């Protein structure tokens, strides 16, 4: 009795028939941006500039932010959905790269910008005005793209 069961197990393992779980398998993650990523579009005097964003909304993810990251691609950032409009403060503890912080109001206007926040510091940074969202990008990005306070912002594929 053991030999027929063993033979059936070996034949089943060598079969080319699709496995039951194959239909539910997820496709591999794309290695390049697909064009369907969430983005923030910002109005400037030269036209609109776009930032591909990672969106964070939970307290643990907001608190971790971009800590321990050694690199942030150009024109990429992290969008914090803060959950309430107030004068938010950020620090750079365990953040390894300089960042610009763009504070955005509920009416989608830039309330203020902290430029080139120094990495690995605990200095509290804010713009002294209420915001509902904060966008972090590479240090110097806002100056390079001439992004200014008062500019209008819109979200693309982001659900606040």
Where are these regions (language model features)?
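Sec-dependent signal peptide recognition
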Residues: 1-7
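C-terminal motif of bacterial Sec signal peptides marking the signal peptidase cleavage site
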Residues: 10-13
């Amino acid at each position: 009795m053991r030999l027929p069961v063993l033979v059936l197990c070996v034949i089943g393992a060598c079969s080319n028939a699709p496995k039951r779980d194959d239909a539910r398998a997820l496709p591999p993650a794309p290695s390049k941006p697909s064009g369907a990523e969430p983005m923030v579009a910002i109005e400037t005097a030269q036209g609109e500039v776009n930032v591909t964003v990672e969106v964070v909304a939970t307290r643990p993810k907001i608190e971790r932010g971009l800590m321990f990251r050694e690199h942030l691609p150009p024109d990429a950032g992290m969008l914090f959905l803060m959950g309430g409009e107030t004068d938010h403060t950020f620090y750079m503890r365990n953040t390894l790269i300089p960042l610009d912080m763009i504070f955005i109001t509920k009416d989608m206007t830039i309330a203020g910008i902290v430029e080139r926040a120094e990495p690995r510091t605990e200095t509290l940074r804010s713009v002294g005005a209420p915001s509902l969202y904060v966008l972090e990008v590479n240090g110097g990005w806002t100056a390079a793209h001439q992004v200014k306070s008062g500019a209008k912002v819109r979200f693309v594929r982001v659900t606040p």
